[in-house]
């Protein structure tokens, strides 16, 4: 998976949140969405992303939440297959 070409992920200090920038505006990401998207680099698989997040946040069962968010992001056109 990778970010779609028209989007740029950026930490927005004024918003105190990760945002997706695109030509027409900005999407403020809630919760762990930014943490997930920072791990999308065109090389990691979904399982790699889940494993990386599990290491960063031990004790949390994140797999289904990550998969649900990735499906949402794909449906919105924020991410695309490599």
Model-predicted regions and their roles:
Residues 1-38:
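Acidic, low-complexity/disordered tracts enriched in E/D and polar residues
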Residues 25-82:
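Long, charge-rich, low-complexity alpha-helical segments
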């Amino acid at each position: 998976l990778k970010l779609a070409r028209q989007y740029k992920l950026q930490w927005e200090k004024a918003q105190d949140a990760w945002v997706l920038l695109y030509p027409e505006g900005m999407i403020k990401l809630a919760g762990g969405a930014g943490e997930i998207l920072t791990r999308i680099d065109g090389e990691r698989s979904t399982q790699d992303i889940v494993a990386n997040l599990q290491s960063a946040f031990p004790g949390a069962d994140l797999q289904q939440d990550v998969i649900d968010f990735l499906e949402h992001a794909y449906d919105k056109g924020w991410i695309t297959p490599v």
